[in-house]
Amino acid sequence: MTFLEIEAFLKITETGSFSAAAEALYVTQPALGRRIRAMEEELGYPLFVRGKGLRKVELTRQGHAFIGIAHRWQALWNETREAALLAP
């Protein structure tokens, strides 16, 4: 799992839309979808409900459970970067 995948997941949950998240992250929608699919394959479960006619992105039960983990992962990543930048 990569920082870019976690970032994509959190941005989709924040915006409620794959297209809005892609625009905010300056990537194409297909590229964003690939990040999410790679993450779901690694985790072994879907994070989002997929289907035609859905106006807003819906999280699966597992997706809801994963939000807190993703936020902690992102915070730890940021702490690690800051510590490395401040190291002598």
Residues of each region from the PLM?
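The N-cap/first-turn positions of alpha helices
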Residues: 2-5, 29, 63
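Short alpha-helical "packing" element that flanks the helix-turn-helix/winged-helix DNA-binding module
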Residues: 8-12, 66
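Short helix-boundary/capping micro-motifs
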Residues: 12-26
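Residues in the recognition helix of alpha-helical DNA-binding motifs
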Residues: 35
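A short LG(V/I)-centered, amphipathic sequence patch enriched
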Residues: 40-59, 78
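Alpha-helical linker/hinge and terminal dimerization helices associated
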Residues: 42-43, 66-88
